A protein has these predicted regions:
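Short, well-structured N-terminal submotif of metal-dependent ribonuclease cores
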Residues: 1-36, 46-57
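A secondary-structure boundary/capping signal
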Residues: 4-5, 38-41, 110
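Nucleotide phosphate-binding site architecture
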Residues: 8-9, 43-46, 115, 123
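Short, hinge-like loop/turn segments at secondary-structure boundaries
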Residues: 52-56, 82-83, 124-125
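Short, structured coil segments at secondary-structure junctions
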Residues: 58-62, 118
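Active-site neighborhoods of divalent-metal-dependent phosphate/nucleic-acid chemistry enzymes
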Residues: 64-108
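Acidic, PIN/NYN-like endoribonuclease modules and their adjacent C-terminal/linker elements
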Residues: 97, 101-125
């Protein structure tokens, strides 16, 4: 499973507040699955920290998938497909979607825009 940036932000906020919310519950429901992240999410998530070490300590609990050229080509294909249908994702979401499709793994996100991407199964939290 590939966790998108909004999931990471929600899970981090729940941990800071010491409460179980939707992201924590999702991790519990899928405790036998491996939650992975993209380098794109690392960039987006860490932008919210004055000290990148704080972000690193939190993100180190997840396995980061490599962004191979093939995943970038998938992102390009997704962009073409969505342009043809009259809509697009943002650049970061495009790369996250391309990574999920390249690896053939579900995407954990509340972003319904990902539902327009052929070949991706979105798991809402």
């Amino acid at each position: 499973m590939l966790a998108d940036t909004t999931f990471l932000i929600a899970f981090y906020a729940e941990r800071l507040a010491r409460r179980q919310g939707p992201a924590t519950a999702c991790l519990g429901r899928h405790r036998t699955d491996t939650f992975r992240i993209s380098v794109v999410s690392i960039a987006e998530f860490s932008a919210g920290f004055a000290n990148p070490l704080q972000a690193r300590v939190f993100l180190d609990m997840f396995h980061c998938l490599r962004l191979f050229p093939e995943a970038a080509y998938e992102a390009g294909a997704i962009d073409r497909e969505l342009i043809a249908s009259g809509g697009r994702l943002g650049e970061a979401d495009n790369l996250i979607a391309g990574t999920a499709r390249y690896y053939g793994i579900p995407l954990v996100s509340n972003g319904r825009a990902f539902d327009r991407v052929r070949g991706i199964r979105r798991i809402a939290y």
